[in-house]
Amino acid sequence: MFKFAALLALASLVPGFVQAQSPVWGQCGGNGWTGPTTCASGSTCVKQNDFYSQCLPNNQAPPSTTTQPGTTPPATTTSGGTGPTSGAGNPYTGKTVWLSPFYADEVAQAAADISNPSLATKAASVAKIPTFVWFDTVAKVPDLGGYLADARSKNQLVQIVVYDLPDRDCAALASNGEFSLANDGLNKYKNYVDQIAAQIKQFPDVSVVAVIEPDSLANLVTNLNVQKCANAQSAYKEGVIYAVQKLNAVGVTMYIDAGHAGWLGWPANLSPAAQLFAQIYRDAGSPRNLRGIATNVANFNALRASSPDPITQGNSNYDEIHYIEALAPMLSNAGFPAHFIVDQGRSGVQNIRDQWGDWCNVKGAGFGQRPTTNTGSSLIDAIVWVKPGGECDGTSDNSSPRFDSHCSLSDAHQPAPEAGTWFQAYFETLVANANPAL
């Protein structure tokens, strides 16, 4: 499994590398590719995107995508990645993504409050960049129907985050949720999921992509020493499985959250993470619409760092692409579909954190690479903005019940309001430091 990742890394580092044929799963084409364009016996070169064509085993290569040796592969839509193939395919292919009117209103008001005309114009442009809608309380769920109706009228794809597990955010405090296990939280969560599924069922012609429960399963990999996480372990698993099954039944394409390179990307965490995700997949009945994994949700890591940030010392998976390429073969071997989406909404500026684990309103951050399906990797379906930039990570007020000490560290922007509320000063920083510039 590691040989495959190593081969991809070598090919990317040495563009002039040439061999007679690419091996199974090796690269065989793409913009700028100068290596071999023929595949080893028993495999066929298949275009995954404009930047990457891959040698797939003949029994996995669709007949319509077969190419002749030495030619540029034709445009095609394939499932990408390795391992089990979801029934949905890449949900972003050929789709326009719906813009949240709620976030657009937040951005418009924020831009109106900026006195610098140039910065205000840049800020206003953020409203045209699609982000996910977070359903972090059951009270927000009734709004989903209106969003779906609007998207249907425009023939657009809707992106949502399912985020309301009981005893949520078990290893931190800033985003503690409304449900507790001590107060029938798991059943309340299932009712919340049922309400989401019921809304989506009314719009079978609208494509929906969902990120499932940020941080939840990652906490079960690394933080079972925290009593709250240990107590929530079975409920997290049962809740995620329930959500996946219910949303699968109404055609939602799903990506389970898997933390980021500085969390599950450490070598010791990769295999346990892959095994946990595979267990969830099997226990949910191998749902055809569970497409894969979401990484870097609401975090700040680069997809492809120009050089390792000093805070990543000791981890060869120092950015999201290294993490993804290390995790993907383990997922595949464990029987989990290895397809990814990556949040780059606030990853425009690197080398600004004191510690890799600093996650709260990181000072000096900027908006990052815009959402696209031109990801440069067959493993990655899309670069996305899951976290709506400008909505706060957590309060710096140490008297708040949801105060987390990470939000008062020296590399956290302060003073900061409660998690999820608008943070004007931070939004202006994200706009000013955007890379690429707005």
Swiss-Prot record:
| Residue span of region Disordered | 57-90
Low complexity bias (residue ranges): 61-79
List S-S links within the chain.
C28-C45, C39-C55, C170-C229, C360-C407
Q: Name one GO biological process term.
A: cellulose catabolic process
The GO terms this record gives for MF are: cellulose 1,4-beta-cellobiosidase activity; cellulose binding
Ranges for domain CBM1 come to 21-59
Q: What is this protein called?
A: Exoglucanase 3
